[in-house]
Amino acid sequence: MATQEIIDSALPYLTKWYTVITLAALVFLISSNIKNYVKAKKLKCRDPPYFKGAGWTGISPLIEIIKVKGNGRLARFWPIKTFDDYPNHTFYMSIIGALKIVLTVIQENIKAVLATQFTDFSLGTRHAHFYPLLGDGIFTLDGEGWKHSRAMLRPQFARDQIGHVKALEPHIQILAKQIKLNKGKTFDIQELFFRFTVDTATEFLFGESVHSLYDEKLGIPTPNEIPGRDNFATAFNTSQHYLATRTYSQTFYFLTNPKEFRDCNAKVHYLAKYFVNKALNFTPEEIEEKSKSGYVFLYELVKQTRDPKVLQDQLLNIMVAGRDTTAGLLSFAMFELARHPEIWSKLREEIEVNFGVGEESRVEEITFESLKRCEYLKAILNETLRMYPSVPVNSRTATRDTTLPRGGGPNGTDPIFIPKGSTVAYIVYKTHRLEEYYGKDADDFRPERWFEPSTKKLGWAYVPFNGGPRICLGQQFALTEASYVITRLVQMFETVSSPPDVEYPPPKCIHLTMSHDDGVFVKM
């Protein structure tokens, strides 16, 4: 066939709009990759190894992640040991050659993303992922919006606010009643912890608890009737499930927006609006009077702004951060304590010395300050957060062309070029289990390691609460609440044990935070 004939036969297809768009995209993609290659060479950067399971499109791992995410089995699917197959535990994948995703676990890169090169990265599409539930809050905003949110919220986590552990005691009493209903039986304590933390969080944030721990089994009437109370906890959980799926979908988040998600968001917003409107109807004098009986997050925010949307969004942002993370920490701590009676006994000795146990418990002596004396308790919580960080996977998006210090090249020692728009995912779960940071027993639950000199030099190899400018404002709040709860349980219950056939390592479920996939079954 003559050249002219070939051109004539191809011309109708070449002029079609979809062909033109495809060719233009291909030209743009090739030119962008060439430019990035030249920039990387100038900066003496080299790519890390390409993820073997990604294929040339890079889409198959994302599809598989979304699929198993729907079954709540993401942590079981993602092979954490995969990082050991690559130099410096770093590799990358590319979505159709356009979107670069670097996955890393080493502390030098985590430090760069979160601190030393903080301004080079943003939350990327997180705002779009989370907006339907959380709106514009501290965990969804970047830039000036984030700075304003942080300045508004920082005073709310001052020592005077987080130190009031006495507000937890009424909820502890109900939790203990629920546990005692299962005396001599194996039961799921994680389910109780999640109900407990939604009760304490709503009281701290809204001024009234939703009392989800109250049920017909206790035979105790709910102290107050709140519109939407019964649906709140379930709706909140379901909404977070969909938020996580949207997050793992990256730029395809908009495909996850079913009616159930929208309905659950509406139920959560209904309750939040109820409390916000109630607070806004109080006079400044009434707010001051109510604040005298105990600290309430919402009442303090009302003194700074009377914008109902700002109040609702910030409250729900803090709710997401404060409720599930603490419940997960408590659940995994009890899971390990039930497996290690020797650790429980040693902890009970420390609690007995400081606060008494059983009928000789001196509950009134448990304060924010006195809990700091319990060094072994602190070590147990540190070890729990090491092995089971609340947010095991996180990511940032490059706002400009930048670099990561290590992970590139065949030996993983070269810097990596990160083009603008690329994603850097850092997997803290794996960081906390690297032998080079924690030794040969990195996969073992051993609180004693926190009394060893090596753990004083961990730096960015231990980041359960993130780090840098966006370090978690509520970390001390969460640790104080967890410390108080465990101390009181140790005082009230002599032993805790787990079934002999309990699965280990435990199956983990990742939504926005990590929890035990099958529940934490113990006997107390």
From Swiss-Prot:
Protein location: Membrane
Membrane topology qualifier: Single-pass membrane protein
Gene induction: By various alkanes.
Record-annotated membrane-spanning stretches: 17-34
Cofactor(s) required, per the database record: heme
N-terminal signal peptide: none
Superkingdom as given in the UniProt entry: Eukaryota
CDD domains associated with the record: CYP52 (cd11063)
Pfam family, one: p450
Any one GO MF annotation of this record: oxidoreductase activity, acting on paired donors, with incorporation or reduction of molecular oxygen, reduced flavin or flavoprotein as one donor, and incorporation of one atom of oxygen
Gene3D superfamilies, sorted: Cytochrome P450
Residues noted as binding heme in the record, renumbered to the chain: C472
Major localization class: membrane
Listed EC numbers: 1.14.14.-
Physiological role: Together with an NADPH cytochrome P450 the enzyme system catalyzes the terminal hydroxylation as the first step in the assimilation of alkanes and fatty acids. Preferentially hydroxylates hexadecane.
Entry similarity comment: Belongs to the cytochrome P450 family.
Protein name: Cytochrome P450 52A6
UniProt source species: Candida tropicalis
Gene name per UniProt: CYP52A6
